[in-house]
A protein has these predicted regions:
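Cell-envelope/extracellular polymer assembly enzymes that use nucleotide-activated donors
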Residues: 2-4, 31
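A conserved acidic beta->alpha catalytic loop
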Residues: 36-45, 95
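Short, acidic, metal-binding catalytic loop of nucleotide-sugar glycosyltransferases
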Residues: 21-30
């Protein structure tokens, strides 16, 4: 059963490693897709460096500019459905709610 968590980001360098560790630490075989809206703080670079730590489980889509949270989720849902994921979850990177 393929499960994926979509995490939109914009300037989340302070949170991204912690939220990814929390999601992967749940031991639920989740895959994670980060949708980054061109964060100038290097959020996408942090995620790209972590991809090798979670091969085949962590993915990133980089968008040009800040296109908004809603469109980031829609982008992620379309990506996940095209890849055949059966369960799609969403979470904010800022820990506004626990994973």
């Amino acid at each position: 059963m393929e499960k994926i968590v979509i995490i939109p980001t914009y300037n989340e360098k302070e949170n991204i490693e912690n939220i990814l560790s929390a999601v992967f630490g749940m031991n639920q075989d989740f895959h994670v897709l980060v949708i980054d809206d061109g964060s100038p703080d290097g959020t996408a670079d942090i995620v790209k460096n972590l991809v090798s730590k979670f091969p085949g489980q962590l993915f990133i889509e980089e968008r040009k500019g800040k296109l908004g949270l809603g469109t980031a989720y829609i982008h992620g849902f379309k990506w996940a459905l095209a890849k055949g994921y059966q369960f799609i979850f969403e979470i904010d990177a800022d820990f506004s709610h626990n994973p």
